[in-house]
Amino acid sequence: MKILVLLSIFIFSVINCNAENYDKKETKTLILYYSQTGVTKQVAEELQRRLGADIEEIEVTNPYNGTYEETIGRCIEERKKDELPHIRPLKSDLKKYRTIFLGYPIWFGTYARPVITLVKSFKFANREIIPFCTFGSGGLIESTNNLKKDLPLAYVKDGFGIREARISRVKEELDRFLKLNGFIAGTVEIFPEYSEQRPVNEEDKKIFSEACSSYKYPLGTPIALSCRKTNKGMDYLFISKGKTPDGKEVNSKIFVTVENNQKPEFTMVVR
C-alpha cells in the first residue's frame, strides 16, 4: 500500500512538473534590431506587439548620433580604415532562439554597420532569419542577399522593408507581410502579376514625376513600365534609365503605388 501511495505521488509530481514547464515555455522568437533615428525601432515595436516575441535593441558603444552628413562621413572613414563599430554585449542568449527577426536601416545599399559587427561575431547556425529594414529608397533585396551570403549556416528568408517616408503605413503593411507569410492568422488580397512591359506615355511620366520628384536624389528617366490593379488602386513598376555617381548608365526598377484618389508614392527602388 505504501508503495502505491509513493508511486501515485511520484506520477502526480511528474505531471505537475511537465505542466509547469509547459506554462513557462520560453519564446522561440526574438526581434533583434539596430535603429539610429528611431524609425526602425517603430517597426520592431510593432512586430513585438503583433507577435508577442522577445525584443532587444543592438547598441553601439560610440553611437552614430550626428547629422545625416556626419554619419555618412564617419561610415566612409570606417570603411577606408576597414573598421567596424563596437556593440554592447547582448542581454539575450541567441542560442535559445530558433527564429530571429533581424532589423536595421539601410546604409550604403545594405544593412547598417552595427549589424555587420553582429553578423561577423555570431553565425546564426540553423536559425531562421527574417530581415526587416527601413530605407530612403531601397535595399531590402540587396541586404537580404548579403545576409544569405554572409550567414551561410542560417536560413535567411525573404524580409520586410518600408520607406522611412511611408512609416505611417507600417501597421498596415506589416500586417499584410505577417499574414502572407503565415506568422499570424488571417487572409490578405493576393496581388496579380504585373502586366507585360510597355513604353511609357505622357500620363505615365506624370505619375512617375509626382511620385518621385520630392526625393532628394535623382531616380532617372522612366522608359518603360508594367502595372497591376489591386483593391486599393494601381501599382506601377517603372524601368528608369539613369547614371551611377561615376557616370555609368544603369537601369533601375522603381515601384510606385497609386491608391484610389491619392497622390502617387514610390515605395522602393531596386538597382
What are these regions (language model features)?
Residues 65-68, 167-172, 234:
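Short, solvent-exposed polar/charged micro-motifs at secondary-structure junctions
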Residues 58-70:
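Short connector loops at secondary-structure junctions
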Residues 39-42, 63-66, 247:
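Short, solvent-exposed loop/turn elements at domain surfaces
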Residues 9-13, 17-30, 34-45, 49-60, ...:
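FMN-binding flavodoxin-like domain, especially the glycine-rich phosphate-binding loop
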Residues 1-5:
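Positively charged n-region of N-terminal signal peptides that target proteins for export
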